[in-house]
Amino acid sequence: MTNEESATPKISVLMTCYNAASTIEESVRSVIAQTFTNWELVLVDDLSDDDSMDLIEKLGDTRIKIKKLPTRHRRTKALNQGFRLCLGEYIAVLDADDIAHPTRFEKQVRLLDTEPSLVGVGTWFTNIDEHGRELSRCEFSSGPTAIKRSLASNSRLVHSSMMYRRESAEVFHGYDEKFDYAQDFALWLSLSRLGELSVIPEQLTKLRRLTDSMTLGKDYSMSMVSDGYVLYRRAQGLEGLRVIDRLKGMRTIGLYGLLYAWRSLRAGNVVRAIGLVITNFWAIPLAVIELLRKSLKSFNSVK
């Protein structure tokens, strides 16, 4: 049986959208262009007030299922609305401003089909600007051991590049709604308790870096640091980490803790800020070094 002949989709592509008219058509067309064709696209519109959905409806592809939310849900709840509609054995994620290489799904399905120990697989990725121009490429050690070690201090798994087993994610009821920003990282930590995570060492995903992207907005700045602080502390409980992995993780926790304290102070939460500084006081020298390193890098870039 070819992948076109199955009545039930092998893959559910999960995409959420909020006012993405400038990018969503290109993203959806990259799904339509996949060499693996047995998929459904579950597209959750989080109360957009532009013509995003009109653009997609005009494509006329019956594999696209649009769920229009009656009220604004924000990112994590919108993802779960879509997650509950997914029928595929595997769920592939693609944001409404990102692009999948034509062979991405085919290669991820092949790996998950042949490696039952894997619960999820991502890809290397290229960062692009709003016009599609390449900004940088991200390539890194990609085997299960390297990925688990990176989860402790510097997760390299990008949500929009991932494909994971739906049944495995259902154990945790999808995405943890306590996390507004890093709901994907929370899921990877949960899935790692059930099996291995890996990455295909090929450039199969393009991530669009937009200055007005939802996850870069001011509303998410506090969630970004609070989620990171909580989740990297949780990552210390991963099995199989080396001492060096845990030490790197503690460094990350300390830096996130101080940044969380600063953001809390600016938001007027003095009590929380003081508590975070006391807890992470030991990381202040690390923060100073990090600031100096970034300043030197910035200085060298303009020389």
Model region roles, listed by residue range:
Residues 2-5, 185-186, 209-303:
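C-terminal subregions of glycosyltransferases and related glycan-biosynthesis enzymes
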Residues 1-32:
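N-proximal low-complexity "stem/linker" segments adjacent to membrane-targeting elements
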Residues 30, 37, 45-54, 71, ...:
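A conserved acidic beta->alpha catalytic loop
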Residues 22-25, 50-58, 99, 103:
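Acidic helix N-cap motif at the loop->helix transition within catalytic regions
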